[in-house]
């Protein structure tokens, strides 16, 4: 149903939202939860937290759902990073620097890059994406540039901005749209 749409605009936003909500049924969301439950990547202690977030979503308690998922995102990024390292993937600073430059063309690459930073770990996923493991580049771009943003212009975004939510700056995230975007980001 989305085929005729090449982009989202004010004119077609409601139509696209209707199609997405129609597709993302309770059964669809339960399927995602089942996949998370069967995941060998995520820390097992994280699963009950994610289950509670989905329960809140199903009860239309969107502030709670988004808050939980926003707080879990960085931990999930680290879970994936640790799994990749456990499988022998090497962390190449040069690749991370190149990814940093492509995401931040207006900024100078820092001389010190923190390996344990979730944003750095995401950049490492980009450098590893050519092998097709887990993430598509556009998904990582969305998480890096939108979800993990600290830009003031995103204070009341239609996206769930993790840093803005967790620091009490973004206050408009109690919507079905924010909650569904949070769930799909985790997935």
Predicted regions and their residues:
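Generic structural signal for short, flexible, solvent-exposed coil/loop and linker residues
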Residues: 17-21, 39, 51, 66, ...
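Amphipathic, oligomerization/interface secondary-structure segments
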Residues: 63-187
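A generic structural signal for ordered alpha-helices
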Residues: 10, 27, 31, 43, ...
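Exposed alpha-helical structural elements
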Residues: 15, 19, 27-31, 48, ...
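A long, hydrophobic alpha-helical segment
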Residues: 36-74
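Generic, low-specificity signal for short hydrophobic/alpha-helical stretches with a mild N-terminal bias
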Residues: 14, 35, 47, 54, ...
